[in-house]
């Protein structure tokens, strides 16, 4: 029997972990496993890396992550508790860090898609199917499906979102020590009023994305009250993508970015 795309009923959202298990279980029953979820964090930030994670959860391991949910709905404390559990129970996971300079050169959206491809390619276990959070990911060597609100609909995407969020937050805390005064540990590089004031006062640092309008205005000396917009320049984002990675030698905040659960 030829493996093919799942029927539309597979991607219907149901509440809670039960709904997350339903989606992946259907794919496994159809012979399409292992199923990988992929998600990103940091698209809208005007400073810091774009972080993309891919995660494979075996069908028998999702129950061990009862607290799993969309990372945006979880408190920082809950995410930190889930992070080591996901690393422990995941069949495989991989986290990719794309630095600000790379985002500027490639563009936010295209860098994000390339990051998703690289995250999937870095998995220690080759998935039979990939679920992405909202974005179609062309160029994957296996079938894939974008799921709107995927981090609340599929456990593997939710797990990837937690891995990406915690990884990025830890990097931003370390960058706060490297670049004092911007408040990276608090706002994580997003365009809050406090960040905008610090940016206007100190000017951009190497971690800022010059493709974002507010950063470009400050850098050019034309800072205005609109500096808090924090949106990428629409003229950017059409070039090819690439990927940069943090390593232990290049940054103290970097953690083990690739994993495979023991005994798998």
UniProtKB/Swiss-Prot annotation:
Please name the InterPro entries in this protein's record.
RNase_HII, RNase_HII/HIII, RNase_HII/HIII_dom, RNaseH-like_sf, RNaseH_sf
GO terms for cellular component: cytoplasm; ribonuclease H2 complex
Name the coenzymes or cofactors required: Mn(2+); Mg(2+)
Q: Which UniProt keywords apply?
A: Cytoplasm, Endonuclease, Hydrolase, Manganese, Metal-binding, Nuclease
The EC number of this protein is 3.1.26.4
- Residues that bind a divalent metal cation: 39-40, 133
The annotation note on the cofactor reads:
Manganese or magnesium. Binds 1 divalent metal ion per monomer in the absence of substrate. May bind a second metal ion after substrate binding.
| Location of region: Disordered | 222-264
User: What GO annotations for molecular function exist for this entry?
Assistant: manganese ion binding; RNA binding; RNA-DNA hybrid ribonuclease activity
Membrane-crossing ranges are none
- Locations listed in the record: Cytoplasm
Q: What function does this protein fulfil?
A: Endonuclease that specifically degrades the RNA of RNA-DNA hybrids.
From the Swiss-Prot or TrEMBL record, give the protein name: Ribonuclease HII
Task: Name its species.
Answer: Mycobacterium tuberculosis (strain ATCC 25618 / H37Rv)
Upper lineage: Bacteria, Bacillati, Actinomycetota, Actinomycetes, Mycobacteriales
């Amino acid at each position: 029997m030829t493996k093919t795309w799942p029927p539309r009923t597979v991607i219907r959202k149901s509440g809670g972990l039960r709904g997350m298990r339903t989606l992946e279980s259907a794919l496994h029953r159809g012979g399409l496993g292992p199923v990988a979820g992929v998600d990103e964090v940091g698209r809208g930030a005007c400073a810091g890396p774009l972080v993309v994670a891919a995660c494979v959860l075996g069908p028998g391991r999702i129950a061990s992550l009862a607290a799993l949910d969309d990372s945006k709905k979880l408190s920082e404390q809950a995410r930190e508790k889930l992070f080591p559990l996901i690393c422990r129970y995941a069949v495989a996971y991989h986290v990719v860090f794309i630095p600000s300079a790379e985002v500027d050169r490639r563009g936010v959206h295209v860098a994000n898609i390339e990051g998703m491809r690289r995250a999937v390619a870095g998995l220690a276990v080759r998935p039979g199917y990939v679920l992405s959070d909202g974005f179609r990911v062309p160029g994957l060597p296996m079938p894939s499906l974008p799921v709107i609100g995927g981090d609340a609909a599929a456990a593997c995407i939710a797990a990837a979102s937690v891995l990406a969020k915690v990884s990025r937050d830890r990097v931003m805390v370390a960058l706060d020590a490297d670049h004092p005064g911007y408040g990276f540990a608090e706002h994580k590089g997003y365009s809050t009023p406090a960040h905008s004031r610090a940016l206007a006062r100190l000017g951009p640092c190497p971690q800022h994305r010059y493709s974002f309008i507010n950063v470009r205005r400050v850098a050019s000396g034309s800072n205005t009250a609109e500096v808090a917009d924090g949106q990428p320049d629409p003229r950017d984002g059409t070039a090819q993508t690439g990927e940069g990675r943090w390593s232990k030698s290049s940054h103290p905040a970097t953690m083990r970015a690739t994993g495979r659960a023991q005994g798998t």
